[in-house]
Amino acid sequence: MLIRLKKRKILQVIVSAVVLILFFCSVHNDVSSSWLYGKKLRLPVLTRSNLKNNFYTTLVQAIVENKPTDSSPDLSKLHGAEGCSFANNVAAHDSGHDSDLSYESLSKCYNLNKTVQESLREVHSKFTDTLSGKLNFSIPQREALFSGSEGIVTIGGGKYSVLAYTMIKKLRDTGTTLPIEVIIPPQDEGEDDFCKNWLPKFNGKCIYFSDIVPSKPLSDLKLTHFQLKVFGLIISSFKRIIFLDADNYAVKNLDLAFNTTSFNDTGLILWPDFWRRVTPPAFYNIIGSSIDIGKRVRFVSDDISPVSRYDPFVSNSNDYTPKERQEHFLKHVPLHDLDGTMPDLSSESGQMVIDKIRHFNTLLLALYYNVYGPTWYYKMISQGTAGEGDKDTFVAAAHALNMPYYQVRTKFEFDGFFYQKDDYKGLALLQHDFEQDYKQYQKAQQEVKANIEEFSKLDPDYTLDNGFLKTLMVNDDGSDLDIMFIHASFYKADPWTLYHENRFIGPNGEQVRGFRKPHRYGMDFELFLFNDMSKSFCTTPKSQVIKFKYFTDKVNTPEWDAMCEYLTNHVNYLESTHKEAMGEKN
């Protein structure tokens, strides 16, 4: 009996040792299995710090090693090529541009020679191979990289710290209690008063690149502007994040965002932008994604209605020869209505909800696109159209890796005002409640399925609005879905710039209201903004005003006092017109 117990204990020790060794090897990819066979390799100490260092070093090395070698072509020359009918900045509401957005048109307008395409495809493939090789971190490893659970992330630094200050106050005003991380770029470190004294009171903290990423990899990348966003998402401590641009204001409580069906189904929520998608066929070739030229699957964002409802070449296919149908799909159907492509509209990255564990590789590939964005991928994905930058790299990465995502189907709304009769000043994109949108989308799917015969008939009067957005994607009573975000990116809430650019002042010097849709988001948003700026920077004793680096050389100057007078005057005007703006009776 004693001998049997000893044998059992010895066996348990051996099994435990083997499990421990295998665990070490899974965490440290650089430890070869040959260690098990007698080679003397020193096993690194298992710490989160070592794991992070290994991760960032390997990631940056893979990005640097797979740099595209060719020079990016001149877009103006590409767009001037024979047969290119490129329509710059086709808006979501524009019609009559199907041929301009077709496979043939976008192919001719971004016609890379085969050698360059193959070169780009090779380095892209090598990088994605690294994602399934050296960077193939297990779920426990990914979770170990990010110590936090759930929270909100924004990018600060410079004037963006000032914008984040007001944005965070609005978050708390809605009742959102999720923790917040403000990512401070390397060149903007030193926001001590904001980061150490004010932010913790609002359950927030600053995250510095230099505290997370080893200095060598960080200097190798030389990140600027748009590239900082995706890297900021990666270095955030949260496993699941709501990302908000610093000028993007939530008008609904976000605490339950991670408990929604849409998020649990996909792990990545995106919102539509103002512009149609113009990514060329060359991009799909580079990422190794095939396009079925003969298969249309949507009409912009309507992928619920049968194609026969809006395309006579499908509903009456027998009336056309195979050659006529092929020409139709190649020359007259928007490329991004075809199977295998990213859906229209283009994406707007001022707000995103991301499961970083599930979409770990999506973020890493998006970083690759952003590092080489200025030289290649920004111009390739957006072809120089308005809003070019990081915004479409997230959906592009998810698409390239065949990862699930949900882009809100409901089109944004605009808020703004007419400065003069024909001079409309758009101030903000109003983005909708993503879970309401997803549930309505599922409901619409069931409605179409239950009435498939009727929906399959060709409707010569079909439009995206009357056939989908204003019929299938609205509440039962016909009302619009809720607004969730006010992305006020045009006149940013930077009091210094607003004053110097004379914003919210009419052509004759009169005060004007800019935000005209308080009924859509249930509050006087403009009054909230100006009230907060006035109290925070003017009526508060100067000794207690947060010492933002951005304001260092501006406080205690005559212009600062003039700025405060500007804010006070506009607050007084907004208060005097508040009831009228909210539709209240005196």
UniProtKB/Swiss-Prot annotation:
Query: In which pathway is this protein known to take part?
Result: Protein modification; protein glycosylation
Report the subcellular localization.
Answer: Golgi apparatus, cis-Golgi network
The answer, when asked if Glycosyltransferase is one of the entry's keywords, is: yes
Enumerate the GO terms in the molecular function aspect: alpha-1,2-mannosyltransferase activity
Keywords (A to Z) from UniProt: Glycoprotein, Glycosyltransferase, Golgi apparatus, Signal, Transferase
What does the record list as GO biological process? mannan biosynthetic process; protein mannosylation
Q: What GO cellular component term, any one, is given?
A: Golgi apparatus
Catalytic class of the enzyme: transferase
In its record, the post-translational modification comment is: Glycosylated.
Give the signal peptide, or none: 1-29
Q: Which residues are glycosylated?
A: 113, 136, 259, 264
Q: What is its EC number?
A: 2.4.1.-
Q: Which InterPro entries does the record match to this protein?
A: Alpha_mannosyltransferase, Nucleotide-diphossugar_trans
Q: What is its main location?
A: Golgi
Q: What does this protein do?
A: Responsible for addition of first and second mannose residues to the outer chain of core N-linked polysaccharides and to O-linked mannotriose. Implicated in late Golgi modifications.
Q: In which family does this protein belong, per the annotation?
A: Belongs to the MNN1/MNT family.
Q: Tell me what this protein is called.
A: Alpha-1,2-mannosyltransferase MNN5
Q: Which gene encodes it?
A: MNN5
